[in-house]
Amino acid sequence: MIVSDIEANALLESVTKFHCGVIYDYSTAEYVSYRPSDFGAYLDALEAEVARGGLIVFHNGHKYDVPALTKLAKLQLNREFHLPRENCIDTLVLSRLIHSNLKDTDMGLLRSGKLPGKRFGSHALEAWGYRLGEMKGEYKDDFKRMLEEQGEEYVDGMEWWNFNEEMMDYNVQDVVVTKALLEKLLSDKHYFPPEIDFTDVGYTTFWSESLEAVDIEHRAAWLLAKQERNGFPFDTKAIEELYVELAARRSELLRKLTETFGSWYQPKGGTEMFCHPRTGKPLPKYPRIKTPKVGGIFKKPKNKAQREGREPCELDTREYVAGAPYTPVEHVVFNPSSRDHIQKKLQEAGWVPTKYTDKGAPVVDDEVLEGVRVDDPEKQAAIDLIKEYLMIQKRIGQSAEGDKAWLRYVAEDGKIHGSVNPNGAVTGRATHAFPNLAQIPGVRSPYGEQCRAAFGAEHHLDGITGKPWVQAGIDASGLELRCLAHFMARFDNGEYAHEILNGDIHTKNQIAAELPTRDNAKTFIYGFLYGAGDEKIGQIVGAGKERGKELKKKFLENTPAIAALRESIQQTLVESSQWVAGEQQVKWKRRWIKGLDGRKVHVRSPHAALNTLLQSAGALICKLWIIKTEEMLVEKGLKHGWDGDFAYMAWVHDEIQVGCRTEEIAQVVIETAQEAMRWVGDHWNFRCLLDTEGKMGPNWAICH
C-alpha cells in the first residue's frame, strides 16, 4: 500500500500542469518526493503498485487526483494513464462513511480551540490535520503572508500558478496527514476487522474483508465522479428566454404589490421604555419612546403684561412638550424584497405563522404559504399576490440571478456539471451542490415544465451522427413504503408488503388514520415517514397541532406493526427517557442503527429513529442500485461516457437520468435498471419486492 498526494495548477476542468507529488510506501516506510520534471517517474511508481496488486491511497482522489492524472499524463506526456478503481482508496470517502456525524463530535474540539471555526464539520484534509495534531499551517495562508511581507498583491488562486519548494514541503505534509488519517480510519473495528493489517494486503483482500459499506461508498464515489464529469446537457437559450418572461412578470407584480400595500408609519428611534401612566411599570411590548426635556404650549413670558396674564404668551412652535412622551415614527413604502414587510402584511391579512427561524422571526417562503387560506376574498387575493411574487423570485434566483443559478454553471461544453456528495447526509443519502440539481422544480409546479425541459439528453448531439441523444429516466417504485413494509414484515408476517404489491395501500392507510380522502392518506403517510411534526400532519386536513397528534395516534393504534417496529427500535437504542421542562432527557444504549450494508447510521433523537432507518434503507438501496445498473450495462458491452453508449447525468434520491445514444440503448438501460433493482432486493434479502418505473424521452420534463 502507498499513500500519495499531488499538487497541480488548477481544478480538474482547467488543470494543465503537474507541479509535484509525494508517495509514502508502507513496504519501505519511506517518503519519496517528485518535482515537475519527475512526472513520468511518479506515474511509473503508481503503475508499479497497481501491477503488484496493491493499493493507492489519496484524499479526494476519486474526484480529483485520479482523473487529473489521466488528463495531465495525456496533456503533458502524451501518455495513456488510467488507475483502476479497485486499486484506489479515498480517505475522504472513508471519512464521510465512518464519521458521518462529524458535526456532533467536533463540538469539543471547537470549544477547546483545537479546530478553527471554518473547519467545523469539515472532512477536508486540512480539518483532519488540526484534529490529528498534524497541521503545520495552511499553504494558501502562508503564501499570502509571504506576499504581504514582500509588498506584493495577492490574486485569487495565484499560489498554484507555479511550483515552489514551499509547495513541495506542504505536499509532503499532506501525505503525512493522509497517512495519519488512514491509520485512524483503519483502526475502526466496526468497519475493519482488527486481526488484519489492512496496510499490508492487496486490493482483493482489502475489499472482501472490510465491511460492505466501505466497498459500496467507494464504488458510488467513483461512479458519481464520472457522472459529474459527464454533466447534464442544458438548453441555455430556453432558460434565458424564461428569465426574460419571469423578469417581466416580476416587474408587473412589484407594481401591483406596491399599489396594494402602499405605505404606513412604523416606530423608529425611540430610546426609552414606555411605562404605565398610573403604576409607572415598564411595558416592554410597546414601542420605545422619547421624553422631551424642552418645549411646551406657550413660550416663557417676555414682559410684565405676559407675566401678569394681561397679555397672552406667544405659542411655542416647537413640536414637543417637555415631559410629554411620544413615539418617533418613520414613513415606510412597501418593499416586496423585505421579508419583514411581507410577513407584516400577511399577518394583517389573517395569516398565522407556524414556522419560525432560530431568531424567532416567521419563516416566509412560497412553500410555507402554499396552503394558506383566509375567509376574506380581498385579503386572500393579497396573500396570493405575495405567494406568486415569492415563487417568481425563487425561480429567477434558481435559474439566473442567484449565486448558484443554473446559467452561472453552464460549462464550455454546454453542460452543467453539478457536484454530488454520495454520502452527504447522516443517513447515507447523497447531497447536491454547485448547483443543486435535486431542487429543479417539478413539472406540476409553476414554470416547472420549462425548467425540467432545459435539462435533457436531446441537448447533446452525437459526435459521429450529429443526432440528439435520448434520455432514460428511471425511478424506484414506492420505495419509502416498501422499506417500511420490509421492516414491518417481522411483526405482521408481510401483510403490509402484500397490500402494497397486490392491494391499495393508500386506502388501507386512509382507514387506519381515519382520514376523509385517499389523497389525504398519501400526503399523511409520506409526511409520517419523513418525520413531519403534529402541526404539519394536522394541516393535511386543514387543522392544527392537536388534530395532527390525534391522526398519528389513531394510525399507530390501527397499524400495530408500525407501533411494534417503533418500540423495537426504541428498545435497541434507549436505556431510559424522561421529559424535563419540555425537553426529552435520554440515556442511550447506543446512538446508531445498523444500515443494510452494515454501516453505523447515527440517530439524533429517539423520535427520529424510524425516519432515519427508512431514509437510510432507501438511500442505500438506490446507491447499490445505480452501481449495479452501470455494472450490468458495461457487462452487456455498453460503454459509459459521451464517447460511448450511455452517460449518467443525474442521480437524485430514488431516480436516475441517463443519456443514451439511441432509443434502443435507452430501452436496454430501462430494462437493466429493473434487473439491477431486483438484484439489490435479493442481495439484501428484502422482504418486499423492489421495482422500478422507466420513461424514455428527450428531456427531464418527459422522463420524470
From Swiss-Prot:
Residues 262-338 are annotated as: Binding to host TrxA. The keyword Nucleotide-binding does not apply. Substrate binds at residues 506, 518, 522, 526. Mg(2+) 2 binds at residues 5, 7, 174. Residues 202-704 are annotated as: Polymerase. InterPro entries: DNA-dir_DNA_pol_A_CS, DNA-dir_DNA_pol_A_palm_dom, DNA/RNA_pol_sf, DNA_polymerase_A, DPOL_T7, RNaseH-like_sf, RNaseH_sf. Belongs to the DNA polymerase type-A family. Replicates viral genomic DNA. This polymerase possesses two enzymatic activities: DNA synthesis (polymerase) and an exonucleolytic activity that degrades single-stranded DNA in the 3'-5' direction. Non-processive DNA polymerase that achieves processivity by binding to host thioredoxin (TrxA). This interaction increases the rate of dNTP incorporation to yield a processivity of approximately 800 nucleotides (nt) per binding event. Interacts with DNA helicase gp4 to coordinate nucleotide polymerization with unwinding of the DNA. This is DNA-directed DNA polymerase.
